[in-house]
Amino acid sequence: MASEFSGQIQELLSRIPPVTRYILLGTAATTILTLCQLLSPSMLVLHYPLVVRQKQWYRLFTNYLYAGTGFDFIMNIYFFYQYSTYLENFVFARNAKKYIIYLVKVALLIDAFSLISGLGSALNQSLAAAIAYNWSLFNSFSKIQFLFGFHVQGKYLPYVLLGFSFLTGGLPSLVVLGFGIISAMIVNFFDSIHTPVVHRSNSPKLNSQKVSGTFIGKGKKLGT
């Protein structure tokens, strides 16, 4: 029984492209260590004095590995898996090097916005919003069933996420989520990432998807 379950897990992981897989595993491991009180979120999150004065540069990246706990964590992991898998497989054609470079650029821009504004210190949701924004560009005609059962086209997903973020977390939450979308726009412009027709979701394979509002969380301000 145990070996069969282990085999199913390995098969599931093997279907996930490498960059997405390792980010998901890193996020899951971080959450487990946090829940077991073996690791404090304050050791991971973005904090200006520690980054600049004490040169703890690792925080520029480790803050993305903390996605909260409970149901929010599960939903954030699910949506990151969905959208990042699509981007890595189809937009970046499973080119791990190019996808890593792209994510690093977006992450550093989000960090810069956060450090300048003083908003947000665990920015996993901002990165997920950036990925969701890119997914929406390539699936602009895909129908998405959002919370409470209303449907939106894929191209409106970023705006729906921003609106729901404002309703649940106020202006700070909206701004933190907006960091991700704006960062993706900037990187896309300079990297000349376009949306070829072949990837637009006229395809019947890209059917209605359900999106939960728990993807939006308040910008976490931890360890400060």
UniProtKB/Swiss-Prot annotation:
GO terms for molecular function: signal recognition particle binding. The chain crosses the membrane at residues 32-52, 60-80, 100-120, 130-150, 162-182. SUPFAM superfamilies: Rhomboid-like. The keyword Ribonucleoprotein does not apply. It is a multi-pass membrane protein. It holds the Pfam family DER1. Its main location: endoplasmic reticulum. PANTHER family: DER1-LIKE PROTEIN, DERLIN. This is Uncharacterized derlin-like protein C365.08c.
